[in-house]
């Protein structure tokens, strides 16, 4: 009788033990390890680009949020994460006019559940730290994307460091067989390189400080693994050099990077000796990346998951880079076209309409025409900012009237001098290629300003010596001189009956014509009869009338594009960056919104004077062709370079005279030879 309880106990223990053994259905089938992957679709540095476009002839385009929806939906399994690595809300006017809110709304709602997270880029702080920190809530209908910056501390609010997501996975051994369910937990941590914080306007980040980004990432990665039980750690970071940054990381599997505007897919050994997969997807929504991070789930041969292990092989990750061409290919499927149309019509169009309404708002009025071409439409294209704006308007003029270049440079000087707590600019420059329109007398709208400065370039201040600044201006005048040669030839060709486009095709602008500089903060006297290096006769600052000192260091306001052109302007390599001020277009908008802004430009930008009332002697030009008549054949003018200038060969008189002289000499020589033989 006493044995029965013992047998019952043994039976109970045996039955209990069975709960830890795979069911008979899995006997021999459940693998010891299951292979899987975490997929991350990612963008970076879109700079306010938002709408799909594709130029088949050039093979280039923009993916945009509508194109991104097509790529997202085309995956056999929806990506586990949609992440962004910064410089997202600032750049194109579509973004800046709403202070980034339009982009934030699209990130939240464009398709599916929208983005999971982003991290700030250096340009994203242009609206202020508080607006950036709360940007994620704009337009959100459910859970908004996360704004992650683990190394930012603010007195006005808390910055999020990371998010986690548990991925439910299922393994199945063929059709009709039982399934095995397990989970993978992923942590995403974000940060911005602390060195980028030093270039931000102090007023925009007041109350915010930045600690070491790599240290902050490592600490959060450790917490996510130990306290949150994360199996995979993904880092999104806006950093000066992604590979250098990755080498400092500990416990991170993947770095999705931004800032360098490059396509990157490499393994870097982290500070813990383990591989970190580093990816970056270009810029301006030209590319979108899809990263697959492989893992091995160790089942230990049982259905229980309490002690299962996950091994991540980050070094074996696979990166796929998509372009607008891939979207174009997918649009051959009507289902994909429907997705694109749905996003464009229901998500993008309402924001486009709001943007158009804002663009039509009048900012101020102008009493003067500030054209960038010979008329408001810019006939010939940029000819004024490349040539005539730097020359006397007509014989007898000694001072140039205000130009569109002066207006732009005046706006830079105005904005950088508006905050007494920051270093104001002494000088300003803008390159011709960055000026895409002019201002006509009358009302000036926000759209007019966007047309002038459409690229979303950033206004920055840099320090450089007076000598380096003068060297740049001198070389700019040399480029302008070559542009003037082309322009004179174009004018003659048009006068002969050709179209403006034919003239430009025949006599092309120099390749570096977009580098001609407009300048402000300085009164300059130019002598066009001199050679490069000697044309600037005098240069005095508008702020105090002092002569520009070659040995002194000055603060120069410029767009972020031209200052990096050390090919045309080698002395720019010596410049040191100080501060970022927002978009160039925003500076111009702020100026024109002020009362009596034209008077302010006149006092800030300065003047261009000429040491002689006459322009330099004109360079040789081709003899203009007669206007073509029906049925006649026109012979193309041929030109050649002579001593660096275009010389005309349309007049053949010198050639004929020379040929006669040579022929006469030959006859005389032959006569002498014949006489001697006799």
Feature map (PLM): residue ranges:
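Bacterial N-terminal signal peptides that target proteins for export
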Residues: 1-8
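Bacterial N-terminal signal peptides
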Residues: 10-20
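Sec-dependent signal peptide cleavage junction
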Residues: 18-34, 647-655, 674
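Acidic, metal/ion-coordinating pockets
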Residues: 28-323, 404-407, 411, 428, ...
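Feature captures C-terminal
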Residues: 34-39, 49-53, 58-63, 143-151, ...
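A short C-terminal boundary segment appended to hydrolase-like catalytic domains
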Residues: 179-183, 295-443, 592-616
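C-terminal low-complexity, Ser/Thr- and acidic/Pro-rich disordered "stalk" regions positioned immediately N-terminal
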Residues: 612-651
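C-terminal membrane-anchoring or membrane-association module
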Residues: 659-678
